[in-house]
Curated annotation (Swiss-Prot):
Pfam families in the record: Arginosuc_syn_C, Arginosuc_synth
UniProt source species: Oenococcus oeni (strain ATCC BAA-331 / PSU-1)
Top-level class of the enzyme under EC nomenclature: ligase
Compartment(s): Cytoplasm
UniProt name for this protein: Argininosuccinate synthase
UniProt binding sites for ATP: 8-16, 116
Pathway(s) per entry: Amino-acid biosynthesis; L-arginine biosynthesis; L-arginine from L-ornithine and carbamoyl phosphate: step 2/3
Length: 406
């Protein structure tokens, strides 16, 4: 009896030709597709396609809610933007996909897992690092990386094995998508001097085509996570879908970014993240009035490390778990509502409130007669605040010596 292998199946040509290729190696192929909110893809057709090509089983797993609640949530709470721009769209879905692949392999007594990553991308590391962590004995196959066909050779192989070639196969782009956004690379985008053409975008309108009137949305957060829009409570996945559509109409969330990949090269990427742009801007704004001074200044250090761990395939690690416990502790006070203005490609926080956790005191901040700040206390504070530097200068005369030399 042939060994079983679980294939991470997208329905595209690469993972489709992988089915007969793996069969030729003696495997019985089980295709697994995870629905994490891919825009416009007919997930049922993907399941039928895998079976038609030769998979013995094809599973479609609805992971949208789990993805939003257990994965996107961590990015929101930690304000995770890789290199200050990228909200980890593709990197974020990989740990969940891999978890389901390993679980399916165990449930079906499979001896191996196959993925469709190339030898040039980050995903090969993300897939294989997580698989090794979850099951060190699991064998891994990487057909796309191993056979290294040209496009013409791949099409010829597809025809020989009755694998349908997608009608959009001539598209130059390599696209990945989920609830949290859309990534696009390759083709004309590989030259960073080329402006991204209109067809590189799908979720967002060009700014010149956006409405001339702004939309305002009130986003309520509880423990650092969005729970409602304009007083309408929603599951997080539904909330993200809603904001993706609304913010996309206003051209919000376009990112043109040359990033440093884990494997050492620089890559030009086009991202569309409408909901992420709105939610993360609102979340950070709410933190500004609810986090204590030292926490607010220290948290970005932890955020950057968490961001890099996610991007660099270290979701499954004790450090990642420990840092997220710190983040979760900080989010207990991040409760309130932020009013966002969506207009001409920008998402701007224009008002915010927190009934029980706001550290902003209008009486302390005002310059009117309602002021309750004790300004005389500032005199003694200045003396104590500068005392270490004052004593150091008195002893060493550093700056006075510099003046004498001049």
């Amino acid at each position: 009896m042939a060994d079983k292998i679980v294939l991470a199946y997208s329905g595209g040509l690469d993972t489709s030709v992988a089915i007969p290729w793996l069969k030729d190696k003696g495997y019985e192929v089980i295709a697994v597709s995870l629905d994490v909110g891919q825009h416009g893809k007919q997930i049922e057709n993907i399941q039928k396609k895998a079976l038609k090509i030769g998979a013995i089983q094809s599973f479609i797993i609805d992971g949208k809610d789990e993805f939003a609640e257990n994965y996107v949530s961590k990015v929101i709470k930690s304000n995770a933007l890789y290199e200050g721009e990228y909200p980890l769209v593709s990197a974020l879905s990989r740990p969940l996909i891999i978890e389901k692949l390993v679980q399916t392999a165990h449930d079906n007594n499979a001896v191996a897992i196959a993925h469709g990553s190339t030898g040039k991308g980050n995903d090969q590391v993300r897939f294989e690092a997580a698989i090794h962590a979850l099951d060190p004995e699991m064998k891994i196959e990487a057909p796309i990386r191993d056979f290294q066909w040209s496009r013409e050779e791949e099409i010829e192989y597809a025809h020989q094995h009755n694998v349908p070639v997608p009608i959009n196969f001539d598209s130059p782009y390599s696209i990945d998508e989920n609830l949290w956004g859309r990534s696009n690379e390759a083709g004309i985008l590989e030259n960073p001097w080329n402006q991204a053409p209109a067809d590189a975008y799908a979720l967002t309108s060009p700014v010149e085509d956006t409405p001339d009137e702004a939309d305002f949305v009130d986003i309520e957060f509880k423990n650092g996570l969005p729970i409602s829009v304009n007083d309408q409570e929603m599951k997080m996945a539904d909330l993200i879908v809603y904001l993706n559509k609304l913010a996309g109409i206003h051209g919000i969330g376009r990112i043109d970014h040359v990033e440093n990949r884990l494997i050492g090269i620089k890559s030009r990427e086009i991202y569309e993240t409408p909901a992420a742009a709105v939610i993360m801007t609102a979340h950070k704004d709410l933190e500004d009035i609810t986090l204590e001074h030292d926490v607010a200044h220290f948290k970005p250090i932890i955020e950057q490390k968490i961001t890099n761990l996610i991007y660099n395939a270290m979701w499954i690690s004790p450090l990642f778990d420990a840092l997220n416990k710190f983040i979760d502790e900080t989010q207990k006070v991040v409760n309130g509502t932020v009013k966002m203005k969506l207009y001409k490609g920008t998402a701007t926080a224009v008002a915010r409130k927190s009934e029980n956790n706001s550290l902003y005191s209008e009486k302390l901040a005002t310059y009117t007669s309602a002021n309750s700040f004790d300004e005389q206390a500032a005199v003694g504070f200045m003396k104590l605040y500068t005392l270490p530097a004052t004593v150091y200068e008195q002893v060493n005369h550093i700056h006075s010596k510099e003046k004498e030399e001049i």
